[in-house]
């Protein structure tokens, strides 16, 4: 019964945050400008291919996007990083999953935030990246923030980690050394580059009910229930949210309540807030070596009398009833949240999607038929909600298969 309640809370939160082309090859591989593999990177509360009873985050009720792309000659892989974790932690996990090895969150970072330095060990989806090669990252929602941070760490490393390693005579992950240029392109889909005001709704809810703590406690309990991780893996090992061998439940729960995670800014919730996103934007900048593409989504209309935005018919029910009305009416002059922030896709404000602006010096340019490096190529806005763009929520008028195959074809045409 407890497992059922946990999964109900989880699925509800996933809806809050985010949450035809015939078969055969779309073009001859010999005509492509690059053969870099595609890597799919999920958003907040996302999951891997082996979780959720095989229900795919990338494809959902519409099918399997990874399989579609592979069947059409585009080598594609799916990452599975922490669904509730910060972008820093997720970027470190993505790196280890790509090249292989043990996740290293950084000695300085771990000491600062009070969690373990090392995480799980992975064989590596593309270990050859250590010797060269490039990849394309297609990221949904928070995954776009994570991808941007990964590129920044790969190329620039972390000065703080380098100085800490030298001062304390500890090892340094290659990720923090910098000088790695293996991401050819980053495509963000419905990403809250400037945050989402939905976090403000959660903050308001916390006045009456500590939602974040409830979720993390549920995650901790679920992580200790047999077989639960096979259905949904919270991947919060770095926070010690796993019961130790021989540890009584009472002792475990007391230790859980004392965890620094409850007040930490090293979480997805902070990174997805407007202030958290702005802080990230101040140091994570577009690389001149990488192409950046941004796709925006919206599923609301503007009310003539109020000026607020309301959900269109067809938006998934949870977002339409719970989230979109708040997003479509929330204004906060102190934060600079005005009428431009009201249009949304049920989870994220559309104005936040075409690239980082608050605290950022990145340039955003409309796509004119030629993709450019080092700037954000704004690919336009699609009339789909946050879940329809990845197939989790069906939309018969949106050809999701054609969308991703066309995108893969564009990425294959990029000159390294």
UniProtKB/Swiss-Prot annotation:
<feature type="active site" description="Nucleophile">
    <location>
        <position position="141"/>
    </location>
</feature>
<comment type="subunit">
    <text>Homodimer.</text>
</comment>
<feature type="binding site">
    <location>
        <position position="394"/>
    </location>
    <ligand>
        <name>Ca(2+)</name>
    </ligand>
</feature>
<feature type="binding site">
    <location>
        <position position="385"/>
    </location>
    <ligand>
        <name>Ca(2+)</name>
    </ligand>
</feature>
<keyword id="KW-0442">Lipid degradation</keyword>
<dbReference type="GO" id="GO:0016042">
    <property type="term" value="P:lipid catabolic process"/>
</dbReference>
<feature type="signal peptide">
    <location>
        <begin position="1"/>
        <end position="28"/>
    </location>
</feature>
<dbReference type="InterPro" id="IPR029058">
    <property type="entry name" value="AB_hydrolase_fold"/>
</dbReference>
<feature type="active site" description="Charge relay system">
    <location>
        <position position="386"/>
    </location>
</feature>
<dbReference type="Pfam" id="PF24708">
    <property type="entry name" value="Lip_C"/>
</dbReference>
<dbReference type="GO" id="GO:0046872">
    <property type="term" value="F:metal ion binding"/>
</dbReference>
<feature type="binding site">
    <location>
        <position position="314"/>
    </location>
    <ligand>
        <name>Ca(2+)</name>
    </ligand>
</feature>
<dbReference type="InterPro" id="IPR056304">
    <property type="entry name" value="Lip-like_C"/>
</dbReference>
<keyword id="KW-0732">Signal</keyword>
<keyword id="KW-0443">Lipid metabolism</keyword>
<comment type="function">
    <text>Triacylglycerol hydrolase that shows hydrolysis preference towards some of the natural oils such as olive, sunflower and corn oils.</text>
</comment>
<feature type="binding site">
    <location>
        <position position="388"/>
    </location>
    <ligand>
        <name>Ca(2+)</name>
    </ligand>
</feature>
<keyword id="KW-0378">Hydrolase</keyword>
<comment type="similarity">
    <text>Belongs to the AB hydrolase superfamily.</text>
</comment>
<feature type="active site" description="Charge relay system">
    <location>
        <position position="345"/>
    </location>
</feature>
<dbReference type="GO" id="GO:0004806">
    <property type="term" value="F:triacylglycerol lipase activity"/>
</dbReference>
<protein>
    <recommendedName>
        <fullName>Lipase</fullName>
        <ecNumber>3.1.1.3</ecNumber>
    </recommendedName>
</protein>
<feature type="binding site">
    <location>
        <position position="393"/>
    </location>
    <ligand>
        <name>Ca(2+)</name>
    </ligand>
</feature>
<keyword id="KW-0479">Metal-binding</keyword>
<keyword id="KW-0106">Calcium</keyword>
<keyword id="KW-0964">Secreted</keyword>
<dbReference type="GO" id="GO:0005576">
    <property type="term" value="C:extracellular region"/>
</dbReference>
């Amino acid at each position: 019964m407890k497992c059922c309640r946990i999964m109900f809370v989880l699925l509800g939160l996933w809806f809050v945050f985010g949450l035809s082309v015939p078969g055969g090859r779309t073009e001859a591989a010999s005509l492509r400008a690059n053969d870099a593999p595609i890597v799919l990177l999920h958003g907040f509360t996302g999951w891997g291919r082996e979780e959720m009873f095989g229900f795919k985050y990338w494809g959902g009720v519409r099918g399997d996007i990874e399989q579609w792309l592979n069947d059409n000659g585009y080598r594609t892989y799916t990452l599975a990083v922490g669904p509730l974790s910060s972008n820093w932690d997720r970027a470190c996990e993505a790196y280890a999953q790509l090249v292989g090895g043990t996740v290293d969150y950084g000695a300085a970072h771990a000491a600062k935030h009070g969690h373990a330095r090392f995480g799980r060990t992975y064989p590596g989806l593309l270990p050859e990246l250590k010797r060269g090669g490039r990849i394309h990252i297609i990221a949904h929602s928070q995954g776009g923030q994570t991808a941007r941070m990964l590129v920044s760490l790969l190329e620039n490393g972390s000065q703080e980690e380098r100085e800490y390693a030298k001062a304390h005579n500890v090892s340094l992950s290659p990720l923090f050394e910098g000088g790695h240029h293996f991401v050819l392109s980053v495509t963000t889909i419905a990403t809250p580059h400037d945050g989402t005001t939905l976090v403000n709704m959660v903050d308001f809810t916390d006045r009456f009910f500590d939602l974040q703590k409830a979720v993390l406690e549920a995650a901790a309990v679920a992580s200790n229930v047999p077989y639960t991780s096979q259905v949904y893996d919270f991947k919060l090992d770095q926070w010690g949210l796993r019961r130790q061998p021989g540890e009584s439940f009472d002792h475990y729960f007391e230790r859980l309540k004392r965890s620094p995670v409850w007040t930490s800014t090293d979480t997805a919730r902070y990174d997805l807030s407007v202030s958290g996103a702005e802080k990230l934007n101040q140091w994570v900048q577009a690389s001149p070596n990488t192409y950046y593409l941004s796709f925006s989504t919206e599923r609301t209309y503007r009310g003539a009398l109020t000026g607020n935005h309301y959900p269109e018919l067809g938006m998934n029910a949870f977002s339409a009833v719970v989230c979109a009305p708040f997003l479509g009416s929330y204004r906060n002059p102190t934060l600079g949240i005005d009428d431009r922030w009201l249009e949304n896709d049920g989870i994220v404000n559309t104005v936040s999607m075409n690239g980082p602006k608050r605290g950022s010096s990145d340039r955003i340019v409309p796509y004119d038929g030629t993709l450019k490096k080092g700037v954000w190529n704004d690919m336009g806005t699609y009339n789909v909600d946050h879940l329809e763009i990845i197939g989790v929520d069906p939309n018969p008028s949106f050809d999701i298969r054609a969308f991703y195959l066309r995108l893969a074809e564009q990425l294959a045409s990029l000159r390294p």
